[in-house]
Amino acid sequence: ITRLWDPAEPVVQTDSELVRQRGEINEMRMLLVRKLRATFPEQFIGGIQDSPYAQTQCPDLILSEHSTWKRIYLHRMKHSKICIASTGLHQSSGWKIAEYLAAGRAIVSEPLCYEVPGPFQAGENYLTYTSADGCIEQIRTLLAHPEQILQMGQRNRAYYDEWLRPDQIVTKALEQAKILL
């Protein structure tokens, strides 16, 4: 499940870079969903969240309201072997990556633009893509090697337990604060 960003929002209109960035994100997301549906029609579960803007751009890709309920999304994500992440606004990594880690899923993602704590590495915790075709190739690689899906999922759950679980975040912040005091 992904969303489109409306480049006509008034707050965006004052910043041509934001308009450009939103357009690129939207184009990549629509292309990705189209190609994933075409390439993996029996396996891919995903689409675009409904919005007035999405209705004008890709009505064929919009998911039903029921499909976007958090409970349904989490159930589907927890029962998927491979989860896909795309870059968000300001080159951010979506919170979905943390959800995928907590669930111990294999991840295929656009390259991360920001540093994350601990040993979280491309090739080990996630495979990267820079195009829709690249995403499909990474998924095919994982599907051809089920042991890699399992191993990546195990590494990701271990990473979550060590670095992202709320108690670990607090503990590490307190440890860091002692160093700085």
Map each language-model feature to its residues:
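Nucleotide-sugar donor-binding catalytic core of glycosyltransferases
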Residues: 1-91, 109-118
